[in-house]
Every structure is written in structure tokens, then in C-alpha cells.
Amino acid sequence: MLRETGVMNIECPATMRRHVQKVLGGEYEVPYRATRPVILDIGTNVGSFAAWALKRWPAAHVHCYEPLPNNFALLKKNPGSLEGQSISLNNFAIGDPSLKNLYLGRNNCGEASFYDVGEQLPATVEVETRAPSVLPKAHIMKMDTEGSEIDILSRMPSIDFDVVMLEYHSEANRRKIDELLADFFLVGGEIRSLHRGTLKYFHGRLVKAAGLLVPRRVG
């Protein structure tokens, strides 16, 4: 196990070190200025995003959702030590409630998934999955669910966050995500490789309020 320095120490397996450092370094940075945002961290893993978010928005409250038992144990040691103050911990998945068997990651504990997207082992762990209707209202939603993004977005009664940040794990899912987030504008992200990347969206009302609905003339 290694410990990374951010808003607090993050304990993680050595195979997660690079990923934790990237998140703590601002992978999910967006120019969102709310002072007390409620944040959903779906696919919390060991807690690096939650730790970064509490440094970025110190008065925020982060609701964490992590189904994998070993990850959840580390989460409780990391930002989960603030449970009841700035953090709420939930040891279940969000998505299709019929899905119970989570494939373990082939390379690290961040690759656990209900789907084989090329980075999973045959071994599975049985977990609990709840529908997105259990989620509280929030300003920001971050998702890193290794292929369950469409399961989650398509089951939401409404998608009314100010900010949505998520990873995608196939080109087909990326295009579907764009359809489901029709009221949002893509404001940032990173394409790491074919079928893999991070996307950041602002709701159209924020873009309209900033006077940016009409593209600026270049040249």
C-alpha cells in the first residue's frame, strides 16, 4: 500500500498510484464556483476524487458510492474518515438493480465492472446495486463506473445537475452519453485512447447565464 498526499493522505494499492495522483492533480477540474455544492461520486474507488473535491470546494458535501468491499474498506480510511461531516458513504453500486456480479479488475482495483470491457478478470464478487432513484439531489455528479454509465444515466428520473463529469469506456457509449446529456454542453475532457476518455459537461442554463450560447467569432 502507498499513501498519496492531497487534501489528506490516500491509501491505495501500488497499481492505483498513478491514477490517484492524476485525480489529486486536478483531472476533474472545472470552472464551477458554487461554494457549498452537493456532489455525487459514483464509483468512488478508494476516495481520490472525493478528497480532491473537498479541497477544491471545502464546504462541499460528497455522497460516495462504492460497491467493491476491498475498495470500500480503503475508502473508509481515506476521505471516509470525515463521514458524517463532509462525506456520506454508501457500500453499493448505482445502476441496473438486476446486476449483482462485479468482475474484478485485471490490472488494478479501479477496473471492477459489471461488464467485460477488456480490463476484467473472470472472477466476480457479489454486490448490491440500487437504482439511480435513490440518489439525493446534487449540483455535481462524477461517474467512473467502467461501462455502467448508460445504465445509470438512462435510469435517472431527470438529469438536472449543474455539472456532470464522467469516464466513458466505448465509442458507442460516448455517443449515447452525448444524446442523454442533450441539455448539457461539453466544456472539457481528455481522450486517452480509442474507447477511453473523460468528459466534463455544464448544464445549458449555466452556459446561458454566462452569455456563451452563441459561439465567439474567431479571427
Model region roles, listed by residue range:
Residues 1-219:
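Phosphate/nucleotide-binding beta-alpha loop and adjacent structural elements of enzyme active sites
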